[in-house]
Amino acid sequence: MTFHFHIPLAFRDLLKSGGIGQYVVQEVLPVRHVDAQFAAFQTSFRTEAPLCILQHFDTLYSILHHFRSLDIAIKEDVLEVMVKVASRHANELPAILEDLNLSVPQRAAHLNALKMNCFILTQLIEAFEAETYKASLGSVEPSGKGKKAKSKPEGFSWESERESILQALTHLLQLDIRRLWSMSVVEEEFVSMMTSCCYKMMENPNIVMAKNKSTREALGHLLGVTVKRYNHMLSASVKVIQLLQHFEHLASVLVHTVSLWATEYGMKPVIGEIMREIGQKCSQDLSRESSGFKAFATFLTELAERIPAIMMPSISVLLDYLDGENYMMRNSVLTVMGEMVVRVLSGDQLEEAEKSSRDQFLDTLQEHLHDVNTYVRSCVIQIYNRIVQEKALPLSRFQSVVTLVVGRLFDKSVNVCKNAIQLLASFLANNPFTCKLSSVDLKVPLEKETKKLKEMREKYQGPKPVVVISPEEEWEAMLPEVLEAFKILQQESKEEEDIETEEIESSQHLREQILILLRKTSYKNSIRLTQKGIERFQEDPLFSEGDSEAKSELGILEKIFTEKKADLEQPTTKDQDDAQVNPTSEELPSQEVQNSDMDKQEMLVQYLSDAHHFALKIEEAIDVISKMMYETAVSVVQEVIEFFVTVSQFGVSQALLGVRRMLPLVWSKEPGVREAVLSAYRRLYLSSNGESERVKAQALVRSLSLLMVDSSAGILQCLEEIVSEFVQKGDIHPSVIQLLWEKFTQKSPCSEFERRAAVMLLGMMTRGQPEIVMSNLDTLVSVGLGEQVQKDYQLAREVCNCILKITDSQKQTLGKSTEPFRLPKDHSLFVCLTEAVAGGIGLSGLHWLPFKETAVRLVYELGEEPEEICSEILLRCSQNVLDGHQTQDEVPNVPAFLLTHLLSLAGDVALQQVVHLERAVSAELRRRRVLKEEQEAEKVGKQRKSKANESTMEEELGLVGASADDIEAELIRKICDTELLGGQQYLSAFLPLILRICNNPGRYSDPDLCTVATLALAKYMMISSDFCDTHLRLLFTLLEKSPLPSVRSNIMIALGDLSIRFPNLIEPWTPNLYARLRDPSREVRKTAGMVMTHLILKDMVKVKGQVSEMAVLLIESDQEISALARNFFNELSNKGNAVYNLLPDIISRLSDPDCGVEEEAFRTIMKQLLSYITKDKQTESLVEKMCHRFRTARTERQWRDLAHCLSLLPFSEKGLRKMQDCFDCYGDKLSDEAVYNSFLTTVAKMRRGAKPELKALIDEFEQKLSRCHNKGLENMDVPEEPSAESDAQPPKAKRPPLASVNVKKGKSEDDFQTPKPPASRKSRRKVAVNFSSDEESDLEAELSEAETPKNPTPIRRTARSRAK
């Protein structure tokens, strides 16, 4: 063998002549000779085995050269044979490699054969891969008419062959083939050839498909062998990075491959190399490839899920990305940290270094909870969610993380809020404290155990140990001061008084005196005494020592201080030792037991303290989350609902708040929200397991009753919808209904509230199953409305409501031709109701009024001839009121509360009579007419055969039906106008009294009586348009002048109903309705806001510029009113261009110096209103209108307001051009600093995200603004002489704040008159209606047609108008 096979860089390089002894392809066979030569190769393979390729390589090369032109059968045969050659070679090589007598030519032959075989196989792999990929691209193209889809060759599938080829190559590489090379070093080109085909296969997007899983496995193993045995690690690391940058689909594939290298092949360093390569990539490099960041982020994230422990040593190389601009890389690195915390750094057995790493990771995560990017904040919360669910978060961090997450509930991002709610729910579900988290319940044991811990400390530890300082240490501290005193003494004259020493009897006494002086820091005197001792007690060894005078005295002082002090301390120490040896009779536990008890108690207190603080934070979160219940984002609402289900299961004290707020969502138009509410209540109240039906029923009734405590009518209606839904679907067991009847009939002991709750629940269930009440109607009447009714009118009212549910269910089920369900007028129900209402009119309790209202409605809903029943009730009540109150002059003197009851009853009857006529009587007339027409049609029996005739008949019948409807409606209207309030009717008997009280509010001063009389008048006005027109001025006068907020609120509500019934009569008074929006009473403003919202959204009131009064409510300090105003504009914004059309007038009114609002308030209002302008055309139009408005602006305040409004609009290129076109309108106003700054804000907003060509236009506009601003400032520097006219002009009055406007009380009745029209309006003089308290005659305040206003009264927000 005289040649060696050199692996070429390119396929065609083998045709070129290389170095000496290098193999070169001699001839590329033509296609027609390929079959014959390939057959010869097969024959040679049977005899020469793998070495046959040495003679037939040119044939195989030719096949590859003509690969696209060859038939599929040849390709398949070549592939099959080459796989056999490689497998055969792999089987023979182990023995050859072990042969010590292998000659050099034989080794060279096997090496050449190995390289040739592998070269041909890798080239075949790449050729088949390219052909398959091209075919897959072609199969995606749509086939036109007449085109046949390309049929795949039968019997051959490249996808199924790939795995066997890769396994054959892997088998070869697993052998010790290094021995074939000289120096046992495999050439790099061979390794590159083997791996490049693998990377080529990975580039195919189809590699990620599930069917190619085995191929991915084979690729991973082949590359793993090269990384481990052939020094391919660094090259593989670089190649992985390149593949990730260019092929986004490979992230998951490479994660599997790389983790395989690290785990099964033990090549952990490759992970560090890849992470280092990623860490060294700069943002500029990655920005060129849009998919680069995403692929790297996905790769790191999924790799951390597989091998976080192996990645952990190299995490530092990625930390720079946390400060980078790309949020995906930040998310990826943070996710990697989270996985390491969960799977590597969790548990109690961590070392200090591991704890430190965990804390650093958690600190980093906490910092990025406030990341500037929404997606990062959301990702961090999700990471924490996983950490909490895996119980990997240290207890010491619970408080800080929960606090941060509660803060994220206020995030502007919907995803962040949603994930924050999920995390708080996970905190609850995985909390290590207790299953019942109530701060109130936890506070008591915490205080108890804290007190116990304090007592234990006092008992076991005793007084705090005193720090013991040795005499030598004390002397060292004193020495500088002693030396200073010695120097001072040497300088002083000896004329100072000598210390008397007569009393010193001995040297021992002298020592004690010196020690006392030293303790008192009297160093000079102690030195003098020492000098005296040296002179006097020479026989004492202490005073006779020392070389020099100074050293002698200092030495004596030191010895006296240290020795004497030590002697004095010894007895104390001895006493303490004796005390330890001889303890008191009360034996204390050993020190170990004491320490153990103390540790246990401290841990208990810490546990309770953490639990208490955690419960407080959760309750704080509940308050915030409950306000998110009505967000527009469905996903957030669903998470809130799920959160409150979790909270309720853990017994948090405020959970009921959220569960109640959840109820109105059952009316949501979003099916997902409604279903979430129903599912939540089903889980909360119907999912008890492992208990008897009786126990479940008791628990359900108890829970629902608790939910009804202090609930409003709206909440109860929502609960009724849910309960009826459960009943219809059979979710409520009959044992629950049985228990409710037992509670109502007092067979089961219960409180009064529980009894009422049982009746309410029975009524709710009746909507879903009417038989519940229908079959027990007699029981309801006898128990709830029987002899004991006067003891509990609340229960009686709920019984009436329960029976009314029959009618509600009947309305839903009965058809138009079915006779309505009604009871005879002598039924026991109406007998009991008559007795209950008449018997309670004389009682002064508060519960009779609502009972009476419900009873009257029940009579009209269920009774036949209800007007006769109610006339009997009114007669009985009138007699009861008059009985016992007659005087000698036969003029009754009736208490105010009796009149209140009587007039309230009369008003309810009047209103229900109208409702009865409009609904029940009208529907019955229509039903009878339709039934009669059907019967007549059956008698005639004529059938139309042609479709034309049938349609003609239907049209005729339709016209007849419409005409008949009009006739019936006219009949009902005539009855209301002429008969109901006629002189002989029972309702008219109460009218004089009602009008007298309303006309004389000074004489009838009882607030309740005035309120009820006004309401009764309004209800009477609902009957007849003539009566309404006659007394409308009286009603509006009371609305404006009455000092009672309850009267004004009730009138406002009544006028809302009157606007719907008689819109033409109320329309001229519309300004008076708007005026109540600035009423001094909070309740009246709230009521007016609700009424006007209803009327405007129902198109019952024309929306004019006066709607600015509603806009003012946006800045109300009362949260309910401001929320009502926000809701109004939210709904109005959904009605086409309503808000857009009103904005110019609203801006004009609110910025008016005479009747506008303060500047800050104006900005707050406009920020809300301009947020509804989202369409470009609307913005452009508003920009133009506001720019032109600058010309007519009178004050600088108006300039600022207009400029601020412009800064709030969302600008486009067209909007900018509009501003430039209108520059002359506002250019001269730019000298005002505030105006100029607002325009700069507008420019800055437009610059964000603008295209390059638009930025040039913005820069030009900004320069123009700057020039005008500077020019205006220069002109302002020139002083101007003030004109006389401007000096003489008085300041204009400004609108006082709402709080300063009060209704004057205590005035005479002359003040109660209809306000005069403005002076500028010329009209005929109108009669002013005066009310005098001295009047005795009945005034009906009837006005002529001329006195009724025909045009709206303009509203002026000036103090002057209020003073009139």
Swiss-Prot record:
Gene responsible for this protein: ncapd2
Protein name, entry field: Condensin complex subunit 1
Location in or out of the cell: Nucleus; Cytoplasm; Chromosome
InterPro entries per record: ARM-like, ARM-type_fold, CND1/NCAPD3, Cnd1_C, Condensin_cplx_su1, Condensin_cplx_su1_N
Compositional bias per record (Acidic residues), positions renumbered to this chain: 1333-1345
Single GO BP term: cell division
Function statement: Regulatory subunit of the condensin complex, a complex required for conversion of interphase chromatin into mitotic-like condense chromosomes. The condensin complex probably introduces positive supercoils into relaxed DNA in the presence of type I topoisomerases and converts nicked DNA into positive knotted forms in the presence of type II topoisomerases. May target the condensin complex to DNA via its C-terminal domain.
Recorded family membership: Belongs to the CND1 (condensin subunit 1) family.
Superkingdom, natural source: Eukaryota
Biased composition (Basic and acidic residues): 567-577
Motif (Bipartite nuclear localization signal): 1317-1326
UniProt-recorded Gene Ontology molecular function terms: histone binding
Polar residues bias (residue ranges): 579-596
Subunit structure: Component of the condensin complex, which contains the XCAP-E/SMC2 and XCAP-C/SMC4 heterodimer, and three non SMC subunits that probably regulate the complex: XCAP-H/NCAPH, XCAP-D2/NCAPD2 and XCAP-G/NCAPG.
Major site of localization recorded for this protein: nucleus
Region (Disordered): 567-596, 1273-1364
PANTHER family: CONDENSIN (PTHR14222), CONDENSIN COMPLEX SUBUNIT 1 (PTHR14222:SF2)
